[in-house]
Amino acid sequence: WRYSRVYKFNSLYHKILSLFPFESDLLKKHGVNFSYVGHPLAKSLSGDIDDIKLKRDLGLSLNREIIAILPGSRKSEIKHHDKPLSDFIKKYKKENPDTEIVLALNKKSDLLGQLEKLSGDIKVIFDASQKVLSVCDLAVVASGTATLEAGILAKPMVVIYKSNFLSNFILSNFFLKTKFIALPNILSQEKIIFELRQSQVIGEQIYEKVILSLKNKKNISEKLESIKQSLLVSESNKFTKAIQEIFSK
């Protein structure tokens, strides 16, 4: 993502605090002074989770399968994902009527379009996406930080990305230097979770990938767990040491 920035690092920064393991080789290659400190989300999301209490707090069923839907954090994302997600929800509920589908949004104003029309048939929860991810069996997630959160929580997921033609053209041709868009796949450099992009983002395709992911749930969760471990640094105070090193100069 925006690879060209690395050429400016030495002139702009005394030291880079790296959050992801794959950044190390890149920074070494260009002679950048850095310390790998791990990702703060890996630690903050690593505590024990009381599923029963959390489900009760969220008003969710204790025994039903839970599918989480995270359509994005921006209105433009939600608009592009609105119809395919709506089509997926209708099909999944028809085939699996006992499943509880939870739509996690940042704020009430994000509830729009066809998803709003479905709000009577699904559970809509605001400003609690991490909690929803913590208790779900699988998530359908718009690409972004939420894919990392779901990965750290070892939750199987299907990642979707749909934007307008110009945005996708610029992203694909000028900024993105990896074949993956989901952070768990980027971190592992293999396709652990399904990614659907642009014309692939349709209800039928999402449904198909969700079914396949649920069948392979255990294997996916184990691979995601290993990614979380790679984001946890062995020294709990490594971040503090890196900061002290900078200010001691």
Name each model-derived stretch.
Residues 1-249:
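Nucleotide-activated sugar donor-binding and catalytic core shared by glycosyltransferases
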